[in-house]
Curated annotation (Swiss-Prot):
Single GO molecular function: rRNA (guanine-N7-)-methyltransferase activity
GO CC terms in record: cytosol
Localization terms from the record: Cytoplasm
Reaction it catalyzes: guanosine(527) in 16S rRNA + S-adenosyl-L-methionine = N(7)-methylguanosine(527) in 16S rRNA + S-adenosyl-L-homocysteine
E.C. no: 2.1.1.170
InterPro entries: rRNA_ssu_MeTfrase_G (IPR003682), SAM-dependent_MTases_sf (IPR029063)
Protein name from the UniProt record: Ribosomal RNA small subunit methyltransferase G
Function description: Specifically methylates the N7 position of guanine in position 527 of 16S rRNA.
Residues that hold S-adenosyl-L-methionine according to the record: G73, L78, V124, E125, R139
Length: 207
């Protein structure tokens, strides 16, 4: 699996240390093991997880601005866990409302010795925003409209929303409230992944 991960990273133009690669593989192995009992993801094959979960998450890393992020609706830690491994200088709050997912995240934190994550069981609307975050990240969590509506209190004055999407979400962009603007949309290159992937970056308009 290490060889496959190395080839995928090379294709994506991402350089990681051996320690980071081993952490990513350890996470995939834990996800595969716990998935049998906890049903954390529909992806069953660890090699497929490398593409659809690991690479699909970490290709976003170069676009994240700041050091304090919250991954809303993180599920089994996607994209937050892979991002925390490739961005060890940043801190990631991993938010999910389901206890079994948060228990898994805490076990990952313990076994991988990840000191830059904080798994939290909470609904996003009820989660406090102090201090505010540099970035609010979501992967398959909600529509853009729901994301900014439910998470409006989380980013700081210069903070951004980072939404990982499949095809270009033109309809969702058109429905954004006028107090928000799309700063940019990046077409992502995810090696060996069928279908398009986009990162939508949103900021609140200055009043």
């Amino acid at each position: 699996m290490l060889n496959k991960l190395s080839l995928l990273l090379k294709d994506a133009g991402i350089s990681l240390t051996d320690h980071q690669k081993n952490q990513l593989i350890a996470y995939v192995n834990m996800l595969h093991k716990w998935n049998k009992a906890y049903n954390l993801t529909s992806v069953r094959d660890p090699n497929e997880m490398l593409v659809r979960h690991i690479l699909d998450s970490i290709v976003v890393a170069p676009y994240l601005q700041g050091e304090r992020f919250i991954d809303v609706g993180t599920g089994p830690g996607l994209p937050g866990i892979p991002l925390s491994i490739v961005r060890p200088e940043a801190h990631f709050t991993l938010l999910d409302s389901l206890g079994k997912r948060v228990r898994f995240l805490r076990q990952v934190q313990h076994e991988l010795k990840l000191e830059n994550i904080e798994p939290v069981q909470s609904r996003v609307e009820e989660f406090p925003s102090e201090p505010p975050f540099d970035g609010v990240i979501s992967r398959a969590f909600a529509s853009l409209n729901d994301m900014v509506s439910w998470c409006h209190h989380l980013p700081g004055e210069q903070g951004r929303f980072y939404a990982l999407k499949g095809q270009m979400p033109e309809d969702e962009i058109a429905l954004l409230p006028e107090e928000y603007q799309v700063e940019s949309v990046v077409k992502l290159h995810v090696p060996a992944l069928d279908g398009e992937r986009h990162l939508v970056m949103i900021k609140a308009n200055k009043i």
